Amino acid sequence: AHPERTFDVGIAEQHGVTLPSDREGFILHLPQLFTVWSEGGLEGVPESFADFEARVSEVLHEIAAGEGRALVVTSGGVIGMAMRVTMALDLPVMAHACLPIRNASLHRFQPLATGLALTQFNATPHLDQRDRQHAWTHL
């Protein structure tokens, strides 16, 4: 077994795929990374894709079963997985949906009788003024 490593190091060492340095490269890289990860092709990473999906699903259901509202501060990866779990997204669609997620963006999931529903995606009202749009970041 390998010592724990990050996903970018794992895919570089095990598959010869380096982390891209620009947006266009990352657009192609993310679906590839998710595919390799979901197929169990990354040894020594902190968590398998299946375990990550199960963990996010469990937390979503735990929060939805609670009383009142909840505020969760998290990463784009967790937001993407929450969308996958909530809307049964296949892997290419999930990867594509993750790409536009902005740092410091707001997302809202609402529990309904039929399950969780995504009711807000990628909102940045605190950065939407013209003089703040320079602060929009994705990576």
Residue ranges and their predicted role:
Residues 19, 92-96, 139:
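A short acidic, glycine-rich active-site loop
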